[in-house]
Amino acid sequence: MSIKEKLSALGLTLPTAAAPVAAYVPAVKSGNLVFTAGQLPVIDGKLVKEGKVGSDVSAEDAKELAQICALNALAAISLVADLDQVERVVRVGGFVNCAPGFIAIPGVVNGASELLIKVFGDVNGKHARTAVGVAELPLNAPVEIEVIVQLKN
């Protein structure tokens, strides 16, 4: 089953890659690795929600936003590589725009991790990860996700 078919089976569609908001590209291929820029929870060019997780945005909503970010990361990867050529997800970096005292950061980033595991499988989808709480994110986004994947030789 292709990656697009797996996404469809999950009720998801690969979006068009979001345009960069500054001086960078959505993804870079270097050897057999693809690095994405940080992806925001954007649908059709618009930020789905903004604000701090734990005050303006619930942890549950933020987890769903992290899934949108991961889907956008797949779209970014598809600009430079065939998604069906992804061997495995290597690493996910998750950044959560936190209200003071909000510490459930790993649960938010799980939204991205769980989607990638569903799409690429339990072995190839599991990855190393960083989940960091931050004071601010671009455009006041609640979540930002970056992904590194390894391509098949």
Where are these regions (language model features)?
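Short, polar/acidic, helix-capping and beta-turn segments at strand->helix junctions
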Residues: 1-153
